[in-house]
């Protein structure tokens, strides 16, 4: 018996009870049984050996099971269980040809396989044809009655109720009415059912709960072949749509889907052979579990290799994917739908359970991509928040409002992105990612607020530095009684202005009052510390400042003109005033006075250092042995220690150093004054003047008696005066007598020669007086009020004498040059006489 192209006849179980797994799989593959779902039926036939079972199946379903050759004798033809597809029957119907019972080949005692195959047929088939001879009805051992009894009993023990149609085919019917035969047969079957020992759960269960009993009679195939074929054809029609309501198996239960038929058959045969306790529903669940799990795993593998999924996954790794949720939902729905289509006929509970497991596994598989998308959304939203916040702040918007608006906008975009990325089949919650985004936004807000406040504070500190540093330094350099009041006023004004502006700006941050008050106080403390720092810096340079102050007062007069020590100045008084100014500056820099607290530092310093108290007290203390020096202390009365810049001891030491370093300046001034007196003393001693008057009385009288002598002396006086002015004799002698004589000697001869040449030219009338010369003459007369004589000779001399003090010129200079030199020399002469 082999396979043909139409029915694909295959041996399912061989005579030794070995299940042909490979053959069954080939059968399922060739016939495409797995595509049928629940739309298939299984028909099995059982009966005595050589009773025409294969012949009936071949005629009934157009199969090609091997039939017995009557001419070769009666022997076993079908060994084991064979199966084939029924040709031309809808729905898909499988015919199973079982090995005949009561065969001599197995013997009387070897009935195990008969019982196993019969039980297998009832457990697997929807319709079981029981082939029996008409004349065996009513016999106890015939008609498979013992076999049916055993099968019923074992089936109740191993399987739960499964509605099966038992179609008794009475062969070679006789003249006995079919009604009588049917009644007798039903009575026999009922007796068999009643005699079966049933489990407690089915003790009162009627036969029709498990079986549909039907009876049909056929004529003899050998004697009435045509009639037999006609009756078989009529019976064949009953197998069309056999599983539809009203069909032969219309009320069947516990049907295994076609895709699980192979596995189910294997497991049933395994249970029967091992005789393990198992009911049909459990078997059904087992088959559904295995098959649904296989389908689910297959769909999961297909999902993992799906090109659309791989492209979507790769795109999600690179960045945001618009429509991610819809695309992924579509991919998942495709495989979930395929699972539903393939597992629709399996046990509903198992199917749903495995579908849920498939769903969970599939969602777990794709979740990393979803999480990546949420990560991109979070990163983009955070970056967008940063950019939007910075833009809002640059546009001058308040910090708190900018944060709220930026956060609201970014969270809205994030929520929309989450909706776009949401997978329909999943219930994933993006709230944790959103919370993390909010935490990230809060963290960035905190750092941004801190940075902005630090920047704002730094700007206002810089502003205070610019507003206070130079003015405070200038006030300290001025160093007077109004120094600290001016500093306090400046500090208060600039601090209040900065605080007011700071409050206007910081209001946009919406900080609590305590925080704002602390920041304002820090700003005030900064301005005060800035002044204190400047004060300490200036205190460190106080000695230099004191010397500068002393030098300024000592070396300049009230009009800030440099002093010329002519011998008329009171150096002692000037020195005292200069030291008083320096000491006043020292008293200003001894302590920080920002709290307007009165002190006696200045009076103590003046009384101790200017009035000589220190030196006097020191002398007295050395004799008495006690200390009453007010500066012998490390602190000032009524001055906090942290406000002290210079201690009394330091002030005393600085004053000594100051006096020591300024004594040289005073000494130099005294020396310059004495030298000036010596250089400017032109008059002879008084005794010499008296002697000259006494001895020169006769000559004086002679001059009075002779006017020509007087005129000659007058001309000589004018010439001498001209030479005096041109040679600038007082200035020359400021550098010493020897140097003055040498300088005048070198200039005297050129000046005299130039003067004589001019006089000669005037006498000969070759030179004409010009307006600029008159102007020069007038300028000279104005600058020499002590000599206002309007003599022609004096004007000529004053306008034409050219100075040769520096370049020793012998040529006559131009009138303008002569006028300029005359003017300069007259001014220098006046300055030297101050």
Swiss-Prot record:
Ranges in the topological domain labelled Lumenal: 705-707
The chain positions of domain GB1/RHD3-type G read 37-252
| Topological category with respect to the lipid bilayer | Multi-pass membrane protein
The protein's Enzyme Commission number: 3.6.5.-
Task: Please tell me which top-level EC class this enzyme sits in.
Answer: hydrolase
Instruction: State the compartments where it is located.
Output: Endoplasmic reticulum membrane
InterPro entries from the entry? G_GB1_RHD3_dom, P-loop_NTPase, RHD3/Sey1, Sey1/RHD3-like_3HB
The domain of life is: Eukaryota
Record's keyword annotation contains Nucleotide-binding: yes
What are the transmembrane regions?
684-704, 708-728
Q: Where does GTP bind?
A: 47-54
Q: Which Pfam families match?
A: RHD3_GTPase, Sey1_3HB
Q: Which PROSITE patterns match?
A: G_GB1_RHD3
What is the designated name of this protein?
Answer: Protein ROOT HAIR DEFECTIVE 3 homolog 2
Q: Which organism is it from?
A: Arabidopsis thaliana
